[in-house]
C-alpha cells in the first residue's frame, strides 16, 4: 500500500495538514490539504512538450466544489454537479492569478491545475486551502515553477488583524482580504472593506504576507521529502541577430507610433509596422524565422519604448503625466424607462450602467454546497467585443466578466442601505461600451451614480481607479488611471475603490517580484488622490440619491403582524393571499416572523392591500360595533362576517326585541348589518347582537 507523506503546521487558529503520496499518484503532482475538516485535493499535470507553433502559456485552473463535501445532494433533475458556479469561477481565478507569473518566460507547455473540494467545514472557506494545495502540488511536481506561494485571509475587528478568520468571524469584520505571494514578494491581493484607511489596508497586506511564511515553509519541507526531480527545461536561446534586425526595421517607427494618442489609430499603425516587419523577414527567405518569434521581439520593442519614456519622465502614451486622471464626462438618467441609469466616460473607457429595483421574489437563490442562501444585490458586468473595436464571441459570460463584476460589487456593497431600511432587491448591470483600461472601475463609478439615480439611499458615492507600475532596477513610476497598453506592458495592475472616507475594495496583481512596501504605499496614496478627484466630479453630477424611486419601480410597504395570524392571511391552500394579490395588483411576501412586504406598481394598490391585511389580522374587540354581512341563515340565527375570515353567530334571540319565529323575516343572505360583539370564547367563537344596538338607540 502507498504511504502518505504529511506535514502539519499551525495557521492562525487552524491546524493545516499537507499530504501527498497516496491519492492521485499518476498526476504530475497531487497534494491533499486539510484545514479543520475542510479537505481539498489539488492535482497538476503538464505536457512534456509544447505544441508546435505555440506562442502563449496555456495554463488552466479549475476549482470544483462537490456537494458530497457538505453532505448534500445537488438539486435539479440530474442530481449531479453542473456548470461552474460563480464561486467556483472566482476561486479558480484566485488560484490562477498568483501562480501564473511564476512560470518562466518561454514555457509554453500546457499545464492543468484541478482543485477539488472533498470535505467542507462550513466555518472554513475552501479557497485558502485550495490556493495552498495548488501551490504545493506545483512545487512537488518538478514542473518549472518559481514558487511556492502562500495564501492567507486577513480580517480586521476592534483595531486588530485576524489571520484566517472563520465564516462567523467575518460577519463582524470590517475587512475580508486575501493575499498571496512568494517568500519574498506579494503577488496578488483581493479584498472588500468597510471604508478603511489606506494605512490599515497596507498593514493587512503586510500582515498576511508575514503570516503566510508558515505555509511556504511547510510546502518547502514537503518538497524536500516528496518532491519529484526538476524538469530539465531550458528557455529557447535568444536569437540576437533577429532581435537586432527587428530593431533595425521597426524600432524608429514603433517609437513614433507611440506618440499617437488615439488608441485605434495607434493600434492600426502598430499593426501595419508589425505586418511589414514580418513580411520583410519572411517573404521569400530560406529558413525564415517564425511569425511568433518576430511578434515576441516586436512586443519587447513596444514594452521597452513605453517603459523607458515613462521612467525618463516623458509624457505617457496619451500625453498625460503619471498623476493625471483622464477627462471625465458623466450623464445620469440617460434611459427613460429604467429605474436608474448613468453613462460614465473616462477617456476612451465608457460604461453604461443601469440599476433595477425588484421585490423579495427577485432575490437570487444560490445553491451553494454549504447550503442555500439568497442575494439581494447583484452586479453583472458585460464586456462585448465592440467595446474594443473587435469582433469576437458574444453571449457567453466569461471568467473575466464574472471577476470584474464581483470586484465592482465588492466596492459598492458596503455603501448600500440595510435590508430593513430599503427592502428592494437591487440589480446593477454595467455594459462596457468602450474600453481602453480600467473598465471595472468605470463600472464602480457608473454603478454608484445609477443607484443614486434610482433613488437607492446610498451612504456615500463610491469611485474606483486603476493604477499601474513601471519598474526597472531601483527606478519606478506609479501611473494613475492606466490605459489598456500600460496595463499590458506594465508590472502591476492595482485597482482601488472607495469613498471620501476610506477604501471599500482593493485588487492587486503583480507581474514581477520585488514590489516593496514603499512602492505599495506610494501607489495607495496616489490612488487616493485620483479617487477624490473622481468623486468630486461624480458629486457635481449627482450629489445625493433621488428623493424617491422611479415611477416605474415597484412601490414597497413593510408591516408586521402577529406570527400566529400568518395562516389567516395566507388562507387554506393560499386562497386568501392569492385573491388579495389579484384584487389589489400587488405582490405580498410573508416571513416566518410576521414581517410582510407589499410591492405594487402603484402606491394606492399597496395601501389597499395593507388595509386588507390589517382587517384580516385585526383582533375582534368585545363591545365594538362592526359593519358585517350575513353569509348564512340558520334555524336558530345567522352567521355574520365582521372581518375577513372572522364570522360570528347572531343568535335568534339577539336579532330583535320581540320573539323571532322566522329568521328570514328579519335578515337575508348578503344583507349588510350592524352588529355588536357580546363575547368571544377561548376557542375563538364570537357572539353577536343586533338587539343590543336597538336598545342603545332607543335609550
Swiss-Prot record:
<dbReference type="InterPro" id="IPR036345">
    <property type="entry name" value="ExoRNase_PH_dom2_sf"/>
</dbReference>
<dbReference type="InterPro" id="IPR015848">
    <property type="entry name" value="PNPase_PH_RNA-bd_bac/org-type"/>
</dbReference>
<dbReference type="InterPro" id="IPR036612">
    <property type="entry name" value="KH_dom_type_1_sf"/>
</dbReference>
<dbReference type="GO" id="GO:0006396">
    <property type="term" value="P:RNA processing"/>
</dbReference>
<dbReference type="GO" id="GO:0000175">
    <property type="term" value="F:3'-5'-RNA exonuclease activity"/>
</dbReference>
<dbReference type="Pfam" id="PF00575">
    <property type="entry name" value="S1"/>
</dbReference>
<dbReference type="InterPro" id="IPR001247">
    <property type="entry name" value="ExoRNase_PH_dom1"/>
</dbReference>
<dbReference type="GO" id="GO:0003723">
    <property type="term" value="F:RNA binding"/>
</dbReference>
<protein>
    <recommendedName>
        <fullName>Polyribonucleotide nucleotidyltransferase</fullName>
        <ecNumber>2.7.7.8</ecNumber>
    </recommendedName>
</protein>
<keyword id="KW-0548">Nucleotidyltransferase</keyword>
<feature type="domain" description="S1 motif">
    <location>
        <begin position="623"/>
        <end position="691"/>
    </location>
</feature>
<comment type="similarity">
    <text>Belongs to the polyribonucleotide nucleotidyltransferase family.</text>
</comment>
<keyword id="KW-0694">RNA-binding</keyword>
<keyword id="KW-0808">Transferase</keyword>
<feature type="domain" description="KH">
    <location>
        <begin position="554"/>
        <end position="613"/>
    </location>
</feature>
<dbReference type="Pfam" id="PF03726">
    <property type="entry name" value="PNPase"/>
</dbReference>
<keyword id="KW-0479">Metal-binding</keyword>
<feature type="binding site">
    <location>
        <position position="493"/>
    </location>
    <ligand>
        <name>Mg(2+)</name>
    </ligand>
</feature>
<dbReference type="InterPro" id="IPR004087">
    <property type="entry name" value="KH_dom"/>
</dbReference>
<dbReference type="GO" id="GO:0004654">
    <property type="term" value="F:polyribonucleotide nucleotidyltransferase activity"/>
</dbReference>
<dbReference type="InterPro" id="IPR027408">
    <property type="entry name" value="PNPase/RNase_PH_dom_sf"/>
</dbReference>
<dbReference type="InterPro" id="IPR015847">
    <property type="entry name" value="ExoRNase_PH_dom2"/>
</dbReference>
<dbReference type="InterPro" id="IPR012340">
    <property type="entry name" value="NA-bd_OB-fold"/>
</dbReference>
<dbReference type="GO" id="GO:0000287">
    <property type="term" value="F:magnesium ion binding"/>
</dbReference>
<dbReference type="Pfam" id="PF03725">
    <property type="entry name" value="RNase_PH_C"/>
</dbReference>
<dbReference type="InterPro" id="IPR003029">
    <property type="entry name" value="S1_domain"/>
</dbReference>
<keyword id="KW-0963">Cytoplasm</keyword>
<dbReference type="GO" id="GO:0006402">
    <property type="term" value="P:mRNA catabolic process"/>
</dbReference>
<keyword id="KW-0460">Magnesium</keyword>
<dbReference type="InterPro" id="IPR012162">
    <property type="entry name" value="PNPase"/>
</dbReference>
<comment type="function">
    <text>Involved in mRNA degradation. Catalyzes the phosphorolysis of single-stranded polyribonucleotides processively in the 3'- to 5'-direction.</text>
</comment>
<dbReference type="Pfam" id="PF00013">
    <property type="entry name" value="KH_1"/>
</dbReference>
<dbReference type="InterPro" id="IPR004088">
    <property type="entry name" value="KH_dom_type_1"/>
</dbReference>
<feature type="binding site">
    <location>
        <position position="487"/>
    </location>
    <ligand>
        <name>Mg(2+)</name>
    </ligand>
</feature>
<dbReference type="GO" id="GO:0005829">
    <property type="term" value="C:cytosol"/>
</dbReference>
<dbReference type="Pfam" id="PF01138">
    <property type="entry name" value="RNase_PH"/>
</dbReference>
<dbReference type="InterPro" id="IPR020568">
    <property type="entry name" value="Ribosomal_Su5_D2-typ_SF"/>
</dbReference>
Amino acid at each position: 500500500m502507498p504511504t502518505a507523506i504529511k506535514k502539519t503546521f499551525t495557521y492562525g487558529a487552524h491546524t493545516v495538514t499537507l499530504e501527498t503520496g497516496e491519492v492521485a499518484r499518476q498526476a504530475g503532482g497531487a497534494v491533499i490539504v486539510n484545514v479543520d475538516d475542510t479537505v481539498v485535493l489539488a492535482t497538476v499535470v503538464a505536457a512534456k512538450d509544447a505544441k508546435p507553433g505555440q506562442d502563449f502559456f496555456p495554463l488552466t485552473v479549475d476549482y470544483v466544489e462537490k456537494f458530497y463535501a457538505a453532505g448534500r445532494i445537488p438539486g435539479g433533475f440530474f442530481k449531479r454537479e453542473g456548470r461552474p458556479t460563480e464561486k467556483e469561477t472566482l476561486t479558480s481565478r484566485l488560484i490562477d492569478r498568483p501562480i501564473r507569473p511564476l512560470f518562466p518566460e518561454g514555457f509554453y507547455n500546457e499545464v492543468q491545475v484541478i482543485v477539488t473540494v472533498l470535505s467542507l467545514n462550513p466555518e472554513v472557506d475552501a479557497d485558502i486551502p485550495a490556493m495552498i494545495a495548488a501551490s504545493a502540488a506545483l512545487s512537488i511536481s518538478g514542473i518549472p515553477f518559481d514558487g511556492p506561494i502562500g495564501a492567507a485571509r486577513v480580517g480586521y475587528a476592534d483595531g486588530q488583524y485576524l489571520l484566517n478568520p472563520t465564516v462567523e468571524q467575518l460577519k463582524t469584520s470590517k475587512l475580508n482580504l486575501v493575499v498571496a505571494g512568494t517568500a519574498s514578494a506579494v503577488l496578488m491581493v483581493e479584498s472588500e472593506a468597510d471604508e478603511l484607511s489606506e494605512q490599515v489596508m497596507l498593514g493587512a497586506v503586510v500582515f498576511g504576507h508575514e503570516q503566510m511564511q508558515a505555509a511556504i515553509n511547510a510546502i518547502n519541507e514537503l518538497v524536500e521529502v516528496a518532491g519529484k526531480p526538476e524538469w530539465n527545461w531550458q528557455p529557447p536561446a535568444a536569437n540576437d541577430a533577429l532581435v537586432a534586425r527587428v530593431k533595425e526595421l521597426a524600432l524608429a517607427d514603433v517609437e513614433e507610433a507611440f506618440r499617437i494618442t488615439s488608441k485605434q489609430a495607434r493600434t492600426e499603425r502598430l499593426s501595419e509596422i508589425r505586418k511589414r516587419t514580418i513580411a520583410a523577414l519572411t517573404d521569400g527567405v530560406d529558413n525564415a524565422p517564425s511569425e511568433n518569434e518576430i511578434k515576441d521581439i516586436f512586443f519587447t520593442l513596444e514594452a521597452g519604448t513605453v517603459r523607458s519614456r515613462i521612467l525618463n519622465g516623458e509624457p505617457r502614451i496619451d500625453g498625460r503625466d503619471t498623476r493625471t486622471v483622464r477627462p471625465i464626462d458623466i450623464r445620469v438618467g440617460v434611459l427613460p424607462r429604467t429605474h436608474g441609469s448613468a453613462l460614465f466616460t473616462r477617456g476612451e473607457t465608457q460604461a453604461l450602467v443601469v440599476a433595477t429595483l425588484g421585490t423579495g421574489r427577485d432575490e437570487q437563490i444560490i445553491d451553494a454546497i454549504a447550503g442555500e442562501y439568497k442575494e439581494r444585490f447583484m452586479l453583472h458586468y458585460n464586456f462585448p467585443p465592440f467595446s474594443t473595436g473587435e469582433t469576437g464571441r458574444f453571449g457567453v459570460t466569461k471568467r473575466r466578466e464574472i471577476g470584474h463584476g464581483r470586484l465592482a460589487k465588492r466596492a459598492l456593497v458596503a455603501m448600500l442601505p440595510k435590508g430593513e431600511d430599503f427592502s428592494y432587491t437591487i440589480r446593477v448591470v454595467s455594459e462596457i461600451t468602450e474600453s481602453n483600461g480600467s473598465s471595472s472601475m468605470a463600472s464602480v463609478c457608473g454603478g454608484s451614480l445609477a443607484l443614486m439615480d434610482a433613488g437607492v439611499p446610498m451612504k456615500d458615492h463610491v469611485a474606483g481607479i486603476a493604477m499601474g507600475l513601471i519598474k526597472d532596477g531601483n527606478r519606478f513610476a506609479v501611473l494613475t488611471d492606466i490605459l489598456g497598453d500600460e496595463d499590458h506592458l506594465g508590472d502591476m495592475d492595482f485597482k482601488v475603490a472607495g469613498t471620501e472616507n476610506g477604501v471599500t475594495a482593493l485588487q492587486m496583481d503583480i507581474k514581477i517580484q520585488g514590489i516593496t512596501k514603499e512602492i505599495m504605499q506610494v501607489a495607495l496614496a496616489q490612488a487616493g488622490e485620483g479617487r477624490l478627484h473622481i468623486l468630486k466630479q461624480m458629486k457635481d453630477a449627482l450629489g445625493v440619491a433621488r428623493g424617491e424611486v422611479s415611477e416605474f419601480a415597484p412601490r414597497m410597504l413593510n408591516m408586521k403582524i402577529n406570527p400566529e395570524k400568518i395562516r389567516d392571511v395566507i388562507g387554506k391552500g393560499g386562497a386568501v393571499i392569492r385573491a388579495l394579490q389579484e384584487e389589489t395588483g400587488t405582490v405580498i411576501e410573508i416571513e416566518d416572523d410576521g414581517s410582510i412586504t407589499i410591492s405594487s406598481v402603484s402606491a394606492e394598490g399597496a395601501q389597499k392591500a395593507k388595509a386588507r391585511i390589517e382587517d384580516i389580522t385585526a383582533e375582534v374587540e368585545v363591545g365594538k360595533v362592526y359593519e358585517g354581512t350575513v353569509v348564512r341563515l340558520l334555524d336558530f340565527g345567522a352567521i355574520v362576517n365582521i372581518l375577513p375570515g372572522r364570522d360570528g353567530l347572531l343568535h335568534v334571540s339577539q336579532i330583535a326585541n320581540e320573539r323571532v319565529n322566522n329568521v328570514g323575516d328579519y335578515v337575508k343572505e348578503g344583507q349588510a348589518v350592524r352588529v355588536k360583539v357580546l363575547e368571544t370564547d377561548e376557542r375563538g367563537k364570537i357572539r353577536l347582537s343586533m338587539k343590543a344596538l336597538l336598545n342603545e338607540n332607543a335609550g
